[in-house]
Amino acid sequence: WVDGVQKRRKLMDLKEYFDNTNGIGVLSTADSDGKVDAAIYARPHFTDEGTLAFIMRDRLTHHNLQSNPHALFLFKEDGPGYKGKRLFLTKVREEQDTELLESLRRRQYINEKDEAKFLVFFQLDKELPLIGGGKK
């Protein structure tokens, strides 16, 4: 029970951090053969069920997650220096073209192609600072 409360508190702290911090994010994945990919992604969405979620199209990142559920989200804060976070993630589920996905979208594009969109949910395995190994 305590562990669940601590995890929820950690996610709430992360939500507040991302709500109040501008920067650039990169989501890195690898396929089942270990071939890696990195792509620019917006800040994660945080769910009531204690997961993080990203909206993605059916491109290489989504493809990689079908055979390897592990990912890393690297976030570098705007400004001088190297402040930010690394979030180690494991995919737990996804949904396609749902009302929830549409409600979470931060941007709408006028000339957007009618392609499938996926809301991919992750559990947070570990959080580290952008630089260094964190507290020991």
Describe the function of each predicted region:
Residues 4-136:
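Binding-site signature for planar aromatic cofactors or substrates
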